[in-house]
Design a protein with these regions (language model features):
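A SIS-like phosphosugar-recognition module
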Residues: 1-194
């Protein structure tokens, strides 16, 4: 399903264009590898998010995570052969019309940014969607547990805060795991994407 290609291309582009030192980049890559292992170890937690009768998934993110939201919704759409409706947007843009996509069969995932200012938009939409009490589940995907949010959260704890480009990789692994598990859930084989 080309998940490895996406991840490798993203990592290579990030490493090429990032102006940080080689040593700093190496430390960040080592950290994202550990975070990736953590996603695999916590697969059941992700499976628990999907243990409900949903038929829609929305991914939201701010800054670089807006593009990550697009890739994430594309992967679930592809691996489910369109059996699950998907949408994506930025955290700020979602409330201006696209939020009408949410119904009581919708899972909403929000990639929470580490930037303090940008993070406010992510938290605002998490709380707004949760407060609407329409979505089946609203799930924050985040690196630390500073999020004040009443919904569910897949949180990477105990790591140094990463820049967006690097944090996108463990975040996308969460989304790829959602896509894989959903593919099996709808009776599709992940090796034959549409």
């Amino acid at each position: 399903a080309m998940t490895g290609s996406y991840s490798c291309m993203t990592l290579i582009a990030t490493l090429i264009f990032d102006t940080a030192s080689i040593d700093q980049k190496a430390a960040w890559v080592e950290q994202i590898a550990k975070m990736g292992e953590e996603v695999i170890e916590r697969e059941q937690e992700i499976a628990d998010y999907l243990a409900c009768d949903f038929n829609r998934v929305t991914y939201l993110g701010s800054g670089s995570f807006g593009g990550l939201a697009q890739e994430s919704q594309l992967k679930i759409l592809e691996l489910a052969h369109g059996l699950v409706a998907t949408s994506y947007d930025t955290s700020m843009g979602y409330r201006h019309g696209p939020k009408s996509f949410v119904d009581d069969k919708t899972l909403v995932f929000v990639f929470v940014n580490n930037d303090e200012y940008t993070r406010q938009y992510d938290l605002d939409i998490l709380n707004e969607i949760g407060g609407d009490e329409i979505a089946m589940k609203t799930i924050a995907v985040q690196q630390d547990d500073k999020t004040v949010f009443g919904g569910e959260s897949f949180t990477f704890k105990g790591y140094n805060l990463l820049p967006e480009g690097y944090l996108a990789l463990p975040f996308v692994l969460v989304a790829q795991t959602v896509s894989l598990l959903n593919s099996v859930r709808v009776g599709n084989t992940p090796d034959t994407p549409s």
